[in-house]
Amino acid sequence: MAPSGSLAVPLAVLVLLLWGAPWTHGRRSNVRVITDENWRELLEGDWMIEFYAPWCPACQNLQPEWESFAEWGEDLEVNIAKVDVTEQPGLSGRFIITALPTIYHCKDGEFRRYQGPRTKKDFINFISDKEWKSIEPVSSWFGPGSVLMSSMSALFQLSMWIRTCHNYFIEDLGLPVWGSYTVFALATLFSGLLLGLCMIFVADCLCPSKRRRPQPYPYPSKKLLSESAQPLKKVEEEQEADEEDVSEEEAESKEGTNKDFPQNAIRQRSLGPSLATDKS
């Protein structure tokens, strides 16, 4: 009897562990993990999403409350999810995550930022009492599905890719820091040149420029020459006529002076002796 009693306790502990293992596993699965591949599931239904980072102390303190809140998800008809921003940088840019942890409520594609107390009871009251209706939803311009936020997501993914390449150059290849920066500078330069050439090619295809043929020099025709020569001839004839009139007037004035000259001289000569006698 003693051996059977001594084996009963270990067997009971083993049964409890085996029975509790799937329970704990199912408990962890209540919180869904959101990635870049399945984030569009948030656009349908009722969701509460937590954005966190493993190194964040506030996020670590929130995890027990979030896990216990997830147990009520089925009763409240709300899906509980979380996003690790260190593994999903695109989603952090898409949702404009500037502080950690950040909690969003989503109802049929309308996103609202939760800014209340971070306890299990407050989360439950927020959903059951529909307190989210008093919060203004995020504008469609800044919604995660907008073109602007999609561009922001791509920018965040590009920055993380550049950081990964930088670490690879330094740690794996052994390049100095300035060598890694030089590689990125050259890559940026060549990519800019290639993008500029592509834009010029597309613009030329969409709006081709009209090629102008060189026009021959407009030589004046004979008619124009004859018509333009006629007023010149008239002007020359008028100038010649004026010159002739001037020359005739000058000639007449000279003749008049020549005729007066001998008469004056005769008078002076005739007056000369008489003046001499008067003086004597």
From Swiss-Prot:
The gene is TMX1. The keyword Disulfide bond applies. It is found in: Endoplasmic reticulum membrane; Mitochondrion membrane; Secreted. Residues 27-132 form the Thioredoxin domain. It comes from the Eukaryota. It catalyses: Catalyzes the rearrangement of -S-S- bonds in proteins. The lineage of its organism: Eukaryota, Metazoa, Chordata, Craniata, Vertebrata. Mediates reduction of intermolecular disulfide bonds between chain A and B of Ricin toxin (Ricin A chain and Ricin B chain, respectively), thereby releasing and activating Ricin A chain. The keyword Plastid does not apply. Residues 218-280 are annotated as: Disordered. Keywords: Disulfide bond, Electron transport, Endoplasmic reticulum, Isomerase, Lipoprotein, Membrane, Mitochondrion, Palmitate, Phosphoprotein, Redox-active center, Secreted, Signal, Transmembrane, Transmembrane helix, Transport. Residues 204-280 are cytoplasmic. SUPFAM superfamilies: Thioredoxin-like. PROSITE patterns: THIOREDOXIN_1, THIOREDOXIN_2. The active site is at C56, C59. This is Thioredoxin-related transmembrane protein 1. A lipid is attached at C205, C207 (S-palmitoyl cysteine).
